[in-house]
A protein has these predicted regions:
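Start-transfer (signal-anchor) and selected internal transmembrane alpha helices
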Residues: 1-47, 57, 152, 292-307
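Membrane-water interface of alpha-helical transmembrane segments
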Residues: 20-28, 120, 124-127, 148, ...
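Membrane-interfacial loop-to-transmembrane alpha-helix junctions, especially the N-terminal start
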Residues: 26-30, 150-153, 195-201, 237-251, ...
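Membrane-embedded helix bundles of polyisoprenyl
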Residues: 34-38, 126-141, 150-194, 198-232, ...
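Active-site lumenal/periplasmic loops and adjacent helix-entry segments of GT-C-fold
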Residues: 44-145, 150-157, 161-182
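Transmembrane helix-loop junctions in multipass membrane proteins, especially transporters and channels
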Residues: 46-50, 111, 115, 147, ...
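C-terminal TM-helix exit segments that contain a strictly Trp-centered aromatic cap at the helix terminus
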Residues: 98-102, 252-260, 308
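Perimembrane helix-loop-helix junctions
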Residues: 219-301
Length: 308
């Protein structure tokens, strides 16, 4: 197995079952902890949620953006026309990726609860599903790198960490919770035994993260840099680096086309722009070429990284 997390992964011997138990049991541990924790958050936030009082203006504006989408505003039209109405509205930088689960819950519950009831359901369910995704990813990772006895504590520590819990309160439907989940998906890719599959998962997760918000760029750069340094030290990790860069570049282009379209190629605040796509494609091409020319050469890879 060639993975950055190799020193942390427990050995595959008979001691593993005694230490951690069967891997398929991790979800049975995650679900009750998640249900208890989110039930507590609902109780603590019930009055705020029932009165439609938001934690942050971004959540309120996100709901309005989804309302407009379901009312017929174009998929690629991200203008908020209620802001600066005289000037033709303000173009929002927010990704439609985050709108999808909110819109899905609202559409699913409208026949049962009506329009307002469906909105209330989305404000309750979407943060809960985000927390479930985060805790499930922590469980999936933790069962592979931690003793089983430590897994409940890991779940609680992550879920109760201030940067996490403030983003998954009932009513918090903006993109920050999904950023946390995608960071964990990128980490999970390092635990895949297959370098190419793991690299593609990590790269695609980073692409989604930055498509949601360009705030993910610094941490994505650190992850790629750490992988590049590891690949320089260990030739077995070079296919993983290549796959990660390829997935990052190709998924970024696909997500840009699917959520922004090519009718607006200008730079916008906190959003991927064509110049970023060009940089990702150039970097992926340089590293891929270096690997194809001399797969085992540290010098060639270093040159490819320099060109990238």
């Amino acid at each position: 197995m060639t993975t950055l997390a190799a020193p942390l992964v427990p050995s595959r011997d008979s001691d593993q079952n005694a230490q951690m138990g069967p891997k398929h049991n991790w979800l049975a541990l995650v679900l009750p902890i998640w249900a208890g924790l989110y039930g507590l958050l609902i109780a603590l936030n019930f009055e705020r949620w029932s009165q439609l009082r938001f934690h942050d203006p971004d959540d309120q504006l996100r709901l309005q953006q989804v309302r407009d989408l379901l009312a017929g505003q174009g998929w690629f039209d991200l203008h908020q026309y209620r802001i600066d109405e005289a000037g033709g509205g303000v173009l929002m930088h927010w990704s439609r990726l985050v709108d999808l689960p909110i819109a899905g819950v609202m559409l699913a519950f409208r026949p049962l609860l009506g329009v307002q009831g469906a909105e209330m359901a989305a404000l309750l369910l979407v943060p809960g599903l985000t927390l479930l995704a985060i805790m499930a990813l922590v469980g999936w990772i933790g069962v592979r790198v931690l003793p089983r006895a430590a897994l409940p504590m890991a779940l609680l520590v992550v879920a109760l960490a201030v940067p996490v819990i403030v983003q998954i309160q009932p009513g918090r439907i903006d993109h920050h919770g999904w950023q946390i989940a995608l960071a964990l998906v990128a980490m999970a890719g390092f635990l895949f035994e297959d370098d190419r599959r793991g690299g593609w998962l990590t790269g695609a997760a980073l692409a989604c993260w930055m498509a949601i918000s360009f705030e993910g760029l610094p941490l994505s750069a650190w992850i790629i840099a750490a992988l590049a340094l590891a690949a320089l030290a260990d030739a077995r990790l070079r296919p993983r680096l290549v796959a990660t860069m390829q997935a990052l570049a190709l998924a970024s282009v696909a997500l840009f086309a699917a959520t922004r379209g090519f009718g607006d190629l200008a730079n916008h605040c906190d959003a991927i722009a064509p110049v970023h796509l060009a940089a990702f494609l150039w970097g992926a091409a340089a590293i891929t070429a270096a690997h194809l020319v001399r797969p085992g050469s540290r010098t060639t890879l270093l040159a490819g990284l320099g060109v990238a």
